[in-house]
Amino acid sequence: MSVSTAAADQSVCTPLPVLGRDVTVPLVTGGEVSYAALDYAASAPALQRVWDDVAAYAPYYGSVHRGAGYLSQLSTDLFENARKTVADFLGCRPADQVIFTRSTTDSLNLLARVIPADCQVFVFETEHHASLLPWQDARVTYLDAPRTPRQAVETLERALADRDPYGPALVCVTGASNVTGELWPVRELAVAAHAHGARIVLDAAQLAPHHPVDLRDLDVDWVAFSGHKLYAPFGSGVLAGRADWLQAAEPYLAGGGASRKVTRREDGGVAVEWHETAARHEAGSPNVIGAYAIASACKALTEAGWDSLVTREQHLIAKVREGLAEVPEVRVLSLFGDDAPRVGVISFVVEGWNSSHFAAALSAEYGIGVRDGLFCAHPLVRTLLGSDAQTQGECGAPEAAPGEKSLNAIRVSFGAGTPDEHVERFVNAVGELVAEGAKWQYRTEDGRCVPAV
């Protein structure tokens, strides 16, 4: 479908209303413009519906599982119903547990704490650091970056078959890259993992906001995601999946809520009986607003219809990719090639530009918010840029003059709340900056490239 056809196609739905859609920001060149939020991959704006639901509940806030009063009972019901909503959203199996955490990072660190002592972990070097780093106490095999989905499956199959000893194993894989937006062959990787007696956890931080995620259909053992990327930025995340490892392990955090019974022992110490439900790993007063916000977002996306949401996002992806393709100095980063299916996450570099300088100009001169740096995926960005594994990369602005080559990139990302005008302004701004240069001078301050005023 061409951009012109898509624009006229009534099947392309309108953006979902998001908080902040009417915010204006000042331009360094004078005047104001509506803010084009194109950094959804870092944090997506709250859906208006999510905000409205949270605001409606807030006066009734009460403690969860800790009170006999009406507001406490209401809040407890809200919290547990949110758990059920998330389970339905993820297609959880009847015996699966849904645990509310702080984020994807927190979820994967929780899982890392509960894996069996002799478990081997297999993870591709292309993962976000939230998936790459939590396994420090386990035997970890880091797999080289594949250049095709088929190569990813074959690489995993070889590694699992060759493991010694042939014991418990866990594979951690992303559903969609936070750098390239490319979809990974999750179902095929799950088949490979299970064929070799391993389990698999899906990092769905970048997948769940863009595509339906179904544990049973994908046949993954666990899934992790963050509310703040799912249009519910209120401090909660989710780990959902098989209960056995979770029930067998010591609680992630020790404290009230996780304990079912605490008694004094004859030797003067204390004996603890931990819950076997999700509460085992939810010690402390839970973030009921965060959980409720995630549930609200799950309902909103489901009711909007995934077919419509995906169609609209593909329309926006086509606009951006076609626009960038018209600028010869732009190189879009990709593992699997131009034809690989992807979500609305695109990273690129511009010949003759420092990526931090380019991102700063987009913000200061056009009111466009993107991200620059290594995107918490340092090994992947080094691979995509063809640099040595030990080369120092840059997160934020380097101590370098504008135009000096840098080991970082620019990322534009969008989703259900993005209007056409935002991506059109972005494409036009890229072309104009490359053709005419920045209108302002920039300098480095506290690790960021900022206008020199």
Q: For each of these PLM feature ranges, what is it?
A:
Residues 1-453:
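Pyridoxal 5′-phosphate
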